[in-house]
């Protein structure tokens, strides 16, 4: 097991820690009596006692964005703008940043054509973002600063002016969870633009060609497939302090911030690598028949109530019943696939993953709703 000092040395050599942070971290290790060998490791590989804390070490507040890798970037841009009317808030070279709602949330469409279309990563945002400090915290929790974003590894990308960043580089921090699912961490003001925090986007976003058919206000949640649910939950909760106030049967809802947003970590037997299964977006005036009609007119095949899609450009609804924490008559959950088969969910702005027809009835940490048995 790599020691605390070894992790700091790796981060410093990879230029993911500045000299001041590096020396301060060494001093903190010396004060707490941590040694440079494996005997200093705790049983769970963490060194949370190194820094006194009153809350989670990385207190994320909101979902910030997702990046899509697509087969035809120009076609996907036209398709998403036609459906949602999202303006362009920024450009990162060929990558296009589509503003979600009033921002700073966004969907990024990668500029290079891909033969593996997917949600490449999701981003969580926190106040007072400091990439050096977060790299250190991740290292203290077993995520090594290797300059890569594989399983339990972190890297910092300095996005320069050629990619729409600051002259000295806009730091963007990525890390892989135990299954290799990539998460990005940024400041709450991050909109995918220039500036040291990525907060400097177009003063007037480039409008979409048309108004779009559906108005999206924000991200609602992501569902992630993992090989070991308890292991993944332990890391996410230890790093971010995500509390469970609601269950969908056996599936816990990890609340992000104080609103409706959440992450759902679904344990899937036989999964060798993690997967961001789908993203959910919040819309006003949620009505299944109305949305089906709009999607059908946009060229999608409506499957009705179904267990899933079997190809691109399909839409269906799943009625989540009491056995999965839903309403007695079923909580409608509407999904569609984009031109590449990427799965997107649409829910009412009140949806919190809970009971009730709109999934709006959630519990508290002390008294969670929806749990089986």
Where are these regions (language model features)?
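N-terminal secretory signal peptides
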Residues: 1-17, 27-31
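N-terminal beta-strand motif that seeds the catalytic metal site of vicinal oxygen chelate
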Residues: 4-13, 48-74, 119-122, 188-233, ...
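Twin-arginine (Tat) signal peptide motif
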Residues: 14-20, 177, 338
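Bacterial lipoprotein signal-peptidase II cleavage site
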Residues: 35-43
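Core segments of cupin and vicinal oxygen chelate
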Residues: 58, 68-107, 223-266
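Vicinal oxygen chelate
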Residues: 71-75, 122-179, 226-230, 279-343, ...
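Fold-core signature of tandem repeat domains
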Residues: 98, 107, 124, 175, ...
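Short beta->alpha transition motifs characteristic of CBS
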Residues: 110, 166, 186-191, 266, ...
């Amino acid at each position: 097991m790599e020691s605390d000092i070894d992790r700091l040395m790796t981060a410093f050599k990879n230029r993911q820690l500045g000299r001041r942070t590096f020396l301060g971290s060494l001093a903190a290790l010396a004060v707490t009596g941590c040694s440079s060998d494996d005997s200093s490791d705790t049983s769970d590989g963490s060194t949370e006692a190194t820094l006194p804390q009153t809350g989670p070490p990385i207190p994320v507040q909101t979902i910030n964005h997702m990046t899509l890798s697509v087969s035809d970037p120009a076609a996907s841009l036209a398709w998403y703008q036609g459906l949602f009317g999202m303006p362009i808030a920024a450009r990162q070279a060929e990558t296009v940043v589509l503003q979600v709602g009033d921002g700073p949330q966004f969907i990024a469409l990668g500029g290079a054509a891909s033969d593996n279309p997917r949600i490449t990563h999701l981003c969580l945002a926190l106040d007072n973002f400091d990439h050096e400090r977060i790299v250190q915290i991740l290292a203290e929790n077993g995520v090594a600063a290797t300059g890569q974003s594989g399983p339990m590894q972190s890297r910092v990308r300095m996005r320069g002016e050629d990619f729409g960043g600051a002259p000295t580089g806009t730091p963007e921090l990525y890390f892989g969870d135990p299954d290799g699912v990539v998460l990005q961490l940024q400041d709450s003001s991050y909109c995918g633009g220039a500036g040291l925090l990525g907060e400097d986007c177009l003063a007037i976003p480039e409008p979409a060609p048309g108004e779009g058919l559906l108005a999206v206000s924000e991200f609602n949640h992501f569902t992630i497939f993992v090989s070991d649910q308890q292991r993944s939950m332990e890391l996410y909760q230890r790093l971010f302090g995500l509390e469970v106030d609601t269950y969908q049967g056996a599936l816990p809802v990890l609340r992000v911030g104080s609103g409706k947003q959440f992450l759902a970590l679904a344990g899937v037997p036989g999964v060798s690598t993690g997967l961001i299964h789908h993203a959910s977006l919040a819309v006003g005036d949620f009505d299944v028949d109305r949305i089906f009609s709009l999607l059908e007119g946009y060229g999608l095949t409506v499957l009705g109530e179904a267990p899933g899609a079997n190809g691109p450009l399909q839409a269906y609804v799943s009625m989540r019943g009491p056995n999965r924490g839903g309403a007695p008559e079923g909580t409608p959950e509407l999904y569609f696939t984009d031109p590449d088969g990427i799965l997107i969910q649409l829910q009412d702005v009140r949806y919190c993953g809970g009971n009730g027809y709109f999934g709006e009835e959630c519990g508290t940490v002390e008294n969670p709703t929806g749990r089986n048995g």
